[in-house]
Amino acid sequence: MKHWRKIVSLSLALLLFFSSVAMISAEEIKQEQATLLLVPLDDRPANVYFPQKVGASAGIQVISPPKEMIGKFTQPGNGQEISKWLLENGDQADGFVISTSMLAYGGLVASRTGVKSLEEATKDIQVIKELKKLYPEKPVYVFDTIQRLAVTAISDEYLKYYSLISEWAVLYDKVVNLGMPGKERLEVLESTIPATVLEDYKKARARNHTVNNLMVEWVNEGYIDHLILAQDDAAPYGLHRAERELLLQKVNQLDVEDQVAVFPGADEVGVVLVSRFVNQLYKTSPAFFIEYGGVHGKDWIAPFEDTTFDYNVQKHIVSAGGRVVDNEDDADIHLLLNTPSESGTPRLEDIEELVARTNELTTSGKQVAIGDVLIVNKADEAFVTELAETVDLTKILAYSGWNTAGNALGITVGHAAARTAFLEQQSGFGVPLYEQAAENHYEFLLHRFAKDQGYKNVVHPAARAYIGQIGASEWDLGNKYDLVNSFVKERLTAETVNWYQYFDDKEVYIGSRGNKDFYKTISSLENVHVNLPWPRIFEAELEPELDLE
């Protein structure tokens, strides 16, 4: 089995010839592509690499500010510099996707602290209004988060308060807002959690809620074309519940329900809004037919979420530019969701049926996207193992099992809707752009399986054990970072090579021009980039590079 391309000697003349062709093709591709400026939630792969790959798989360029502007881990991004960057590059853009959390506070982690005042935060988001005034015809999509229950686990000390503050926020909502029992435990928590930690938490929540409200008002005033307020990790009860209800009331009062979506999630929203831009660009709206591999979404509230899952599915599809259909004959995309088995149903039976259904659809030429939402933060190992042995993975349109159900859902839906929109558009792009888009598509698909199964189920547990052996903390690697990073690089590269076997030498469809369909063969895995972006092992950069011939 081929894994790595053998490097052979070429004559200088031949090398120069092919280099010239590549340069011409690259320039032609750039001229054909639309450009989207993305201000990400933070610098992690889910918020930068994922949207860029999904955009590239749909034939567009997604460009984010330089790394030094968007911060890293506990170092916040610079909203003022990012605002300048947006204004300096706005002329070249065809649209904007902007994280308010990055502009206002410096990113997701910084948004959970009260360091930035409300005055400072609102000052740094004024660029949103400026962009719409300068470019009224260009779409401005904005997303913000409704703060999660817990603080960020940036150290073992903060990890101690992670669960306590979550419990306090849930109990406060039950006892104070809803008159339910639990007052004694609430008082114990308030005496246990340091006053400074609790006050900072409440200060951040109040400020963020004010900014959430302001964004809804800006939709009504015409500065924002579509707004997503994503509920970060939550539960059915908590301070966020009251905040969400107030926001929904405001949305209804202003009659902007068609432009504002409120749903559980956070890290997937960049992908969702890239997909929305793609579908607007190509004037498409893919039809999704939804099938559940286990319990129906109306009967399940996923962990860390506060609404029924079917509600979340509907909201993600519409925000991504798609639509839901009740008749599978009308579907452009079959969305298969790997949900928990119903009581009394053997798990293996559900797995076999879902894999068989996937195989039935793909072999008959249907587009299938899979949301592996069963287990938080990783693939359902039994399911993806059976899937890989039974189904041609290159025939699957999109897959994700990463993090919360909402995260996995949004990544799957966004990738599927964007890729479908590109394949259905009639813009008459040149073949080089189809080739480039296909490479990006299959690279991201390989990334998803290798990351969600290979990293989360194999490498991550091994890395956790290794960290214990060398006396480090998985939440702050400190001076052990290089050791752990090398450990992860070696093993995740091997896992990616292993998953590449299901892509190697497969002929794949890349697009059509007129009446002619074009195909390429996945010929090699050229490179695998692996790195830990933050000094912890929760997430890893994984960027495989494929060659199609």
For each feature predicted by the language model, list its residue ranges.
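Bacterial N-terminal signal peptides that target proteins for export
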Residues: 1-11
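Generic detection of intrinsically disordered/low-complexity segments and helix-coil linkers/edges
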Residues: 11-12, 528
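An N-terminal assembly and electron-transfer interface module characteristic of large anaerobic redox
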Residues: 28-549
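A generic structural micro-environment signature
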Residues: 7, 22-24, 108-110
